[in-house]
């Protein structure tokens, strides 16, 4: 009898996971055109000819809004499974979720007071 009787599927899965990217890259190398023309070296920007410089400095406010968005996006990711299983989790999980939301509200108030949410 085979010793790893419960792990054959895992072994096959790992082999397929290792071979699939290798096969995809190999097929790409075989099927890709070998010549590099002038169009290959040109810049592509949404189907239009690029204009202006590529290196421009963004306002730091974009990053602040992005960070606040990511924080509340992660909050949604954490709270959705909690909301789905709310009835089975009980009072302790409800209190933990309230503490989590309170910490995020404190962070939002801090960002608001520091002016991170104002554009001017």
From Swiss-Prot:
Any GO molecular function:
NADH dehydrogenase (ubiquinone) activity
Please list the reactions this protein catalyses: a plastoquinone + NADH + (n+1) H(+)(in) = a plastoquinol + NAD(+) + n H(+)(out); a plastoquinone + NADPH + (n+1) H(+)(in) = a plastoquinol + NADP(+) + n H(+)(out)
The disulfide bonds in this chain are none
Q: Where in the cell is it found?
A: Cellular thylakoid membrane
**Superkingdom per UniProt:** Bacteria
Q: Recorded E.C. number(s)? A: 7.1.1.-
Membrane-topology descriptor? Multi-pass membrane protein
Give the family per the record.
Belongs to the complex I subunit 3 family.
What name appears for this protein in its UniProt entry? NAD(P)H-quinone oxidoreductase subunit 3
